[in-house]
Amino acid sequence: MNEARVAIVTGAGSGIGRATALRLARDGYSVVVNDLNAERAEAVAATIRAGGGSAIGVVGDVSSESDVVALVRCTEQAFGPCTLLVNNAGFAHQVPFIELAPADFDRIFAVHVRGTYLCSRAVLGSMLAKGHGVIVNVASQLGQIGGVELVHYSSAKAAVIGMTKALAREVSAHGVRVNAVAPGPINTPLVASLSESWRRAKAEQLPLGRFGEPEEVAATIAFLASSEASLFVGQTLGPNSGDVML
């Protein structure tokens, strides 16, 4: 009997996380929809179930070790061990560096970096024991090139890219693949929260001439989760409308 495919998607109540949860459900995964907002998490899970898929919503803060432990416990009780983790939870806000409060800097790192660490650590034991598993971290192109008034966010996403590479080197020989995506401007609530002037100017700069859609990033994540990406280890793919070419 084939092992059940079980995905945890953090920050899946909206945007890229929501699109990823829906895509993975269509691909045959049982999906655990994590979000800080209970209504959003359950709404996404209900949409998946209405389409014939299997899903539950689990509220939790990825920067909290106890919440992450509970998230993995709920996953295993509902569907079995996690075989795919998508570390997507995150947020951003623009602020000049000189005005960036230490508490805001720490919170960005707590969610993006500590959260990625805690969730990866929580599922890795079962993946290593079985000799297979996939982790996909959602970074950002700003982790590669930086962003004005986004020093805290850019630094955290750079750390996520570094963690992706280091962990991939450590566990790939044991059957666990770790990769990342670094989206450019995507039509999500997070990007909508940035200034209109920035969004307008950015759209004009893109070689493709448009922002991406969450579903396009979800397709990249689904590819990295698939057997077709078996040679991708420690890589950071850039669905970014041509904004960054590496």
Question: Which role fits each region the language model picked out?
Answer:
Residues P96-F97, D104-F109, V191, K202:
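Substrate-binding pocket helix/loop in short-chain dehydrogenase/reductase
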